[in-house]
């Protein structure tokens, strides 16, 4: 795990890590809440971070009021939250960097890029939005009653994390993952801190900043995820000059779940101009490690079938397909459907 350091932002200490030796500095701004040390204990997230570090020098931090950073002395405004990016860049010795923000982290990256264009090399958002709540002229946000329902769920089940299972259906039944997620939540924020963070997100409306973004921009969204409607990213791409929109497969809001390499490949290509040569990988096990259902799903995936098509063929839910594929990828040591198909013979899988 990389060393954790602190940067001073006014009266608040911001915890950050810098790792990787790629040619591009990349500030990774997480969504909602985070814990930069516990992140390395979850295999999917740790692999996501290592993959970023393979092509960039990554600056990863906990926003004020979450994780290892100081609690916010009061409800921080957008300007304060956004300026924490500048502070960690200074501390890490980065004069100019690409910005990568997940969910509300994307909003902070957009605000930073608009305020500090000279320090922003490029912008990547994933699963983000221009406004969190629905309005007459912005129909993709959450209705106020849905926010209230989510807050009630947080109050009832913060300690277990079950209130957020709908955001990441591929791991909803994965007991090991859910146990880590519950511990991650408890370490990253108290229930009242989590409620406060979601309340701040509900107030976000950065539509007025979008015309000020003048750097190369990549907007990524999983078309079928339910936590943040894809219409949000379509709006961002339509209102940021020259932005490229990439819609990817999957149902999870967290980018490190499901086919994370589809997202990572898009980011690497955007930032570096191409993909590094595939490195030789050793798989943990072969086809014999898969359950019968996993073998069925993998065979259909190798044949080119989509998750909805596999679900229909096997009379199961798309959520179940995504969950089985994620487990199969982990067992086989592959990270995408493309790699699965390419290495099927080596892994003892028939197409």
Locate predicted features:
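Conserved HGGG/HGGXW glycine-rich cap/lid loop of the alpha/beta-hydrolase fold
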Residues: 6-70
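Conserved acidic catalytic loop of the alpha/beta-hydrolase fold
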Residues: 79-97
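Flexible "cap/lid" loop of the alpha/beta hydrolase fold
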Residues: 110, 114, 120-153
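Conserved alpha/beta-hydrolase catalytic His-Asp/Glu region
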Residues: 156-200, 209
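Short beta-strand/loop motif that positions the catalytic acidic residue
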Residues: 213, 219-221
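Conserved alpha/beta-hydrolase "acid-adjacent" motif
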Residues: 226-232
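Catalytic active-site module of serine/aspartate enzymes centered on a nucleophile-bearing elbow/loop
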Residues: 243-283
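Helix-turn-helix DNA-binding segment
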Residues: 279-326, 330-332, 339-351
